[in-house]
C-alpha cells in the first residue's frame, strides 16, 4: 500500500510517452494545414527535437524498471502474444519512424509528399502506442482496480491534457502563431474537466472493490488529497497558458515551459496513484 512512487520509471515512461504523442499530433496537424511558410515549416520540424528528447528520457526510464537495459530486448520476445511486448514494440516503432523521418526532414531529404505520409503514419503509430500502454494494464482481470474503463480514459486524457500544451510550446519556440492555436487550450481544459469527473467516479467505485484481505480504498489512503493536488497543478498550468491569452497577449515561452512542468507534475501524481492502486483478487497485495 502507498502512492505508487516505487514505480516511478513506469510513471515517467507512460506520462512522457502520452504527452509526446499528443504533442506530435499537434505539430503534425500544423504542418499539414499548408498555411505555414517553408521557413516556418522547417522551424516547426526542428522544434520536434524536444519531442524525441522527452521520448528518449521515457525509454531510458523504462529500462531502469527492467533492472538492466539489456533486458529491454528480452521484453520483445513475445510480440503479438504479450501486452508488455506489444507496448515496447509499438513504442519503439513510433520512436524509430518518428525520429528517422524527423532527421530526414531536418536534413531536407524528405519530399513534401513523403513528409505528409510520414506525419500521418507517425500519428497513427502514436495512437497505437498509447493504446498498447492501456492494454498492458486493462487486460489483467485479476487486478480489478485496473480492469476498468478508467484506465483507458486516464491514459488518453493525459494525451489530451499534456499534448496540446507541449505542441503549443514547441510551436511558440518555432515562432508560429495563429487563431487556430487558441483552440488548443480549450482541448486541454475540456480534457481536465472530464478527468475531474473520472477521478470522482473512480473514487466512489473504489469503495466497492475488495479482495479477500483488502479494500481497494485502503490501497492509497490519501487518494482524495493526492488527486486534489493533481487537479490544482493542472489548473495552475492551464492558468499560465490561458490567462495571458484572455488578456490579449501571447504567453511567454518561459511561462509555457513552467506550465508544462506543472502538467508533468500533476500527471505524475495521478499516475503514481494509478500504480498505488494495484491489487489482486487473491490473497496478495503488491507493496
Residue ranges, per PLM feature:
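Alpha-helical membrane-inserting segments
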Residues: 29, 57-60, 166, 170
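N-terminal signal-anchor module of multipass membrane proteins
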Residues: 1-57, 276-277
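Intrinsically disordered cytosolic tails
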Residues: 265-273
Amino acid at each position: 500500500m502507498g502512492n505508487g512512487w516505487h514505480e516511478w520509471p513506469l510513471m515517467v515512461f507512460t506520462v512522457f510517452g502520452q504527452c509526446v504523442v499528443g504533442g506530435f499530433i499537434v505539430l503534425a496537424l500544423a504542418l499539414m494545414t499548408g498555411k505555414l511558410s517553408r521557413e516556418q515549416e522547417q522551424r516547426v520540424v526542428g522544434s520536434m527535437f524536444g519531442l524525441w528528447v522527452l521520448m528518449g528520457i521515457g525509454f531510458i526510464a523504462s529500462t531502469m524498471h527492467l533492472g538492466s537495459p539489456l533486458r529491454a530486448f528480452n521484453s520483445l520476445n513475445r510480440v503479438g502474444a504479450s501486452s508488455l511486448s506489444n507496448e515496447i514494440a509499438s513504442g519503439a516503432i513510433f520512436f524509430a519512424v518518428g525520429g528517422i523521418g524527423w532527421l530526414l526532414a531536418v536534413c531536407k531529404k524528405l519530399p513534401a509528399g513523403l513528409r505528409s505520409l510520414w506525419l500521418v503514419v507517425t500519428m497513427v503509430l502514436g495512437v497505437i502506442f498509447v493504446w498498447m500502454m492501456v492494454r498492458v494494464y486493462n487486460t489483467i482481470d485479476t487486478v480489478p482496480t485496473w480492469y476498468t474503463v478508467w484506465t483507458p480514459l486516464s491514459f488518453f486524457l493525459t494525451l489530451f491534457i499534456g499534448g496540446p500544451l507541449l505542441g503549443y510550446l514547441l510551436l511558440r519556440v518555432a515562432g508560429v502563431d495563429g487563431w487556430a492555436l487558441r483552440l488548443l487550450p480549450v482541448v486541454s481544459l475540456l480534457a481536465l474537466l472530464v478527468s475531474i469527473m473520472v477521478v470522482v467516479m473512480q473514487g466512489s467505485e473504489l469503495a466497492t472493490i475488495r479482495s479477500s484481505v483488502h479494500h481497494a480504498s485502503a490501497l492509497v489512503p490519501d487518494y482524495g488529497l493526492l488527486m486534489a493536488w493533481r487537479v490544482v497543478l493542472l489548473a495552475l498550468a492551464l492558468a499560465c497558458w490561458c490567462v495571458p491569452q484572455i488578456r490579449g497577449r501571447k504567453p511567454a515561452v518561459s511561462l509555457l515551459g513552467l506550465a508544462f512542468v506543472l502538467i508533468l507534475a500533476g500527471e505524475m501524481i495521478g499516475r503514481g496513484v494509478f500504480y498505488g492502486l494495484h491489487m489482486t483478487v487473491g490473497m496478495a497485495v503488491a507493496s
